[in-house]
């Protein structure tokens, strides 16, 4: 029988990022921010704090399950901060697939920038429950606060940590400035 914690495997990501950083102008915090319009490559790791998830609702049938929950993802590296993650998890038991969608807000820094807040309502994580393969895409594009920046990240699951929380690696790019 499938345990309910499997849906979160697709959610989890702790990010360690490396970036090619341009010389930038000081931000209001006094930290350097890569030059406006400059795109930097990023990569790293992350962890989904599944053990502290708040489950809001869960509906199940013999062939599928839908769960709505709120989780926190910790990021370190070039993206250093946290993600508040409100997720809808859909599990298709027949096809052995899990899909996560919903809303998330990132609060932290990017490549040493001043703090930013970015929203994403287009992310999608998939898990093949037969093989364990996990992957997803994140679109941190809706600016809320701080320097203007947009990031697109591809994530790949790396399994649970010692506490049972899902982990992942990611690669992508962030563009400073713009709309």
Regions found by a protein language model. Give the residues of each.
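Positively charged n-region of N-terminal signal peptides that target proteins for export
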Residues: 1-4
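Beta-strand-enriched cores of mature, soluble protein domains
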Residues: 25-179
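Bacterial N-terminal signal peptides
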Residues: 7-18
């Amino acid at each position: 029988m499938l345990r309910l914690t499997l849906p979160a495997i697709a959610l989890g990501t702790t990010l360690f990022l490396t970036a090619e950083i341009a010389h930038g102008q000081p931000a209001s915090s006094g930290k350097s921010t890569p030059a406006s319009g400059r795109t930097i490559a990023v990569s790293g790791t992350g962890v989904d704090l599944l053990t502290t998830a708040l489950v809001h609702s869960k509906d199940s049938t013999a062939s599928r399950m839908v769960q709505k929950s709120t989780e926190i993802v910790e990021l370190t590296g070039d993206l250093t901060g946290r993600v508040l993650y409100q997720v809808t998890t859909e599990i298709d038991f027949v096809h052995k697939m899990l899909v996560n969608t919903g809303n998330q807000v990132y609060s932290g820094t990017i490549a040493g920038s001043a703090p930013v807040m970015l929203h994403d309502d287009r992310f999608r994580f998939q898990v093949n429950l037969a093989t364990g393969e996990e992957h997803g895409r994140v679109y941190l594009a809706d600016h809320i606060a701080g320097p203007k920046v947009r990031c697109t990240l591809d994530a790949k699951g790396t399994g649970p940590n010692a506490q049972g929380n899902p982990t992942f690696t990611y690669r992508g790019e962030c563009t400073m400035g713009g709309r």
